[in-house]
Structure formats: C-alpha cells, structure tokens
A protein has these predicted regions:
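Non-transmembrane "mature" sequence context
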Residues: 27-30
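Boundary at the C-terminal end of the N-terminal hydrophobic targeting segment
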Residues: 22-24
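Short, functionally critical alpha-helical segments immediately adjacent to catalytic or ligand/cofactor-binding
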Residues: 34-51, 67, 103, 118-126
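Extracellular/periplasmic catalytic domains that process cell-envelope and extracellular macromolecules
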Residues: 32-36, 58-60, 113-116
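Secreted/periplasmic proteins that engage bacterial cell-wall peptidoglycan
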Residues: 39-81
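Bacterial N-terminal signal peptides that target proteins for export
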Residues: 1-9
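Bacterial N-terminal signal peptides
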Residues: 9-19
C-alpha cells in the first residue's frame, strides 16, 4: 500500500511539471503564452491532494480536479462550437492530462484574458459564481500557489 501511494504521488508530481497553456482542444490554434501550471497544480492540491481517482461524497465530482458531468458536457459544447471533432467522456475525468485539458478549454472560452482570480472562483462556483460563495476556496488555492 505504501509503495502504491508513493508511486501515485511521484506520478502526480511528474505530471504537474508538464507546462500547460490555454489552447487545449484546439488543433492548429496558436498557444497562449500564459502559463496556467501554478494555478492548475494548486487546484489539484485543494481538490484531491493529487489523487486522480478521487470521488466526492455525492459521486458526481471525480478525478484530481473534481470534474462534474456538467463540466464534461460544457467542454464538449465548446469543442462543438469550435468545430472540433474531439470529445471528452465521463471517464476522462480520471485522467490528469485530460482534466488539465478540460480546465484549459474552459478557461480559453470563459476567461480569455487569463484572469487567475476568475479562473479559481469559476472553477469552484461555476461561471455565475459569487465572491462570497467562493472566498474560502479562493484563499485555499492562492495559499497553495505561494
């Protein structure tokens, strides 16, 4: 069990070193220069402590970034609007790489100015978040980025 936990932590740490930019899911689209890696890593730490197999109590949010079925559906809608044939499935929520791609796709659509605060708050409270409702989460994520 210890060996499995150690291996899982090592894999998650290695995956966190892969730089991410805001062009996920768009073939032929020039990558944004903004590096979301610190934000993504902090969200992963807050959401699941790096556990790619994490499932919340309700069973709806899954994976290292605790992605909901609604977010998968929204990512597929964005891909459809962009005339992409790529689609995400529910099981993709358990893939660290695909979870990061979904985050980047969501940000590229709803947060084109790469506003870190907007990214963190909307990841927790949805696109219609309230500052009050996301304040605790925002502070947690920001503390992990320092």
């Amino acid at each position: 069990m210890y060996r499995l936990a150690k291996t899982t932590c090592l894999v998650c740490m290695l995956l966190m070193l892969i730089p991410m930019n805001a062009s996920a899911g768009i073939k032929g689209k020039k990558a944004s220069r903004f590096d979301w890696t610190p934000v993504i890593n902090a969200i992963i730490e807050v959401e699941s402590e790096g556990d790619a197999k994490a499932v919340d109590k309700s069973g709806k949010s899954c994976g290292c970034m605790q992605i909901t079925p609604l977010l998968v559906k929204e990512c597929n809608r964005i891909l459809d609007l962009r005339k992409s044939s790529k689609r995400y499935s529910m099981k993709d929520r358990f893939s660290v790489r695909k979870s990061k791609e979904m985050f980047l796709l969501y940000q590229s659509f709803y947060n084109p100015k790469n506003d870190v605060e907007l990214a963190i708050r909307s990841w927790n409270g949805g696109i219609n978040f309230t500052k009050r409702g996301t304040q605790k989460y925002y502070r947690k994520v920001m503390s992990k980025m320092k």
